Amino acid sequence: MSDETTVGGEAPAEKDDARHAMKMAKKKAAREKIMATKTDEKGLIIVNTGKGKGKSTAGFGMIFRHIAHGMPCAVVQFIKGAMATGERELIEKHFGDVCQFYTLGEGFTWETQDRARDVAMAEKAWEKAKELIRDERNSMVLLDEINIALRYDYIDVAEVVRFLKEEKPHMTHVVLTGRNAKEDLIEVADLVTEMELIKHPFRSGIKAQQGVEF
């Protein structure tokens, strides 16, 4: 029995492979043409926001990339300071020489129920954040859950925006996480990602679990 062939003796699978190769070659050429125009480098202002999971996780992913490359970086946690997390334990135990880690929050606002104390802690965290960002040895600074502090006006968003525009070193990346990012912050950012919530186990009665949420 002979294989099915097209006119000219080319098998259908071979014809599909040739078509695919040509299509991918065109995509590659177009991509390379675009990439050739992208030559600038700068420190990015990155905002991870939205109701979905993964805002802090994405931020820590970039921090771990920095650690892997031996690039000095820092983390300031504005809300989760009272919670023991896997990323905090790992960094403090094994990578403290590359990444500075500061937990200056005392928990979510509904846990503390003390606005004056929350404001004081947020302001303290912001002062530390500014210090770390000004230090040009730090290639990246993650401001974890700062958007929550901004949402409740614990910190003035205008001051944060002004600082990022006027005082952030040119090559320093700053990552700001938390839902409900303020429009003024979104406007000044270079990269904004909104995490969309489609399904969440909490709605099915499943609690936050070690290794997934913390």
Curated annotation (Swiss-Prot):
GO molecular function terms listed in the Swiss-Prot or TrEMBL record: ATP binding; corrinoid adenosyltransferase activity
Main location per the UniProt record: cytoplasm
Domain of life: Bacteria
GO cellular component: cytoplasm
Presence of the UniProt keyword Transport in the record: no
Positions that bind ATP: G50, K51, G52, K53, G54, K55, S56
InterPro entries: CblAdoTrfase_CobA (IPR003724), Co_AT_N_dom (IPR025826), P-loop_NTPase (IPR027417)
Subcellular localization: Cytoplasm
Oligomeric form and interacting partners: Monomer.
Protein's name according to its UniProt entry: Corrinoid adenosyltransferase
Organism: Sinorhizobium sp
